[in-house]
C-alpha cells in the first residue's frame, strides 16, 4: 500500500 507522511514530505510504497 502507499503511505504518505506529510511532515516528512514524502511517500513510500510498502504493499
Curated annotation (Swiss-Prot):
Comment field (misc): The primary structure of this fragment is identical to that of Omega-lycotoxin-Am1a from Alopecosa marikovskyi (AC P85079).
Entry function: Modulates Cav2.1/CACNA1A voltage-gated calcium channels (P/Q-type currents) in rat cerebellar Purkinje cells and hippocampal CA1-CA3 neurons. At saturating concentrations (>10 nM) decelerates activation kinetics and slightly increases peak amplitude without affecting deactivation kinetics. In vivo, does not cause death when intravenously injected into mice. In rat models, through its activity on Cav2.1/CACNA1A, has an ameliorative effect on memory defects provoked by hyperstimulation of N-methyl-D-aspartate receptors (NMDARs) in the hippocampus.
Location within or outside the cell: Secreted
Chief subcellular location: secreted
Protein name as it appears in the record: Omega-lycotoxin-Lp1a
One function term, GO molecular function aspect: toxin activity
UniProtKB keywords: Calcium channel impairing toxin, Disulfide bond, Ion channel impairing toxin, Knottin, Neurotoxin, Secreted, Toxin, Voltage-gated calcium channel impairing toxin
Tissue expression notes: Expressed by the venom gland.
Family statement: Belongs to the neurotoxin omega-lctx family.
A cellular component term, taken from the record's GO annotations: extracellular region
Top-level taxon: Eukaryota
Domain remark in the UniProt entry: The presence of a 'disulfide through disulfide knot' structurally defines this protein as a knottin.
